[in-house]
């Protein structure tokens, strides 16, 4: 298991993007969280099998039907704290 951290920019707040990401992560069996950032971006931390996380990055780039993703910056790392589900933090 590895950890992926991403910062997603574009029109990604107020457009159901975090809910879309939570659904995708849950369906793929990933754990972690997503949260809005003060600068208008969305932060994502996900843990799982490398191949599944790579598939998840495709979902991050695609976005919800109302969103418009400009960029996804991804950082791969070893697992820090472990999570039991994928949550939307407020």
Give the role of each language-model region:
Residues 1-90:
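Intrinsically disordered, low-complexity, mixed-charge
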């Amino acid at each position: 298991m590895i950890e992926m951290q991403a910062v997603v920019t574009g029109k990604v707040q107020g457009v159901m993007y975090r809910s879309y990401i939570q659904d995708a992560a849950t369906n793929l069996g990933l754990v972690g969280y997503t949260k809005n950032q003060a600068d208008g971006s969305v932060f994502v931390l996900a843990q799982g099998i490398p191949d599944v996380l790579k598939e998840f990055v495709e979902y991050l780039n695609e976005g919800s039907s109302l969103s418009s993703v400009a960029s996804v910056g991804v950082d791969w790392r070893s697992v820090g704290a472990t999570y039991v589900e994928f949550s939307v933090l407020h």
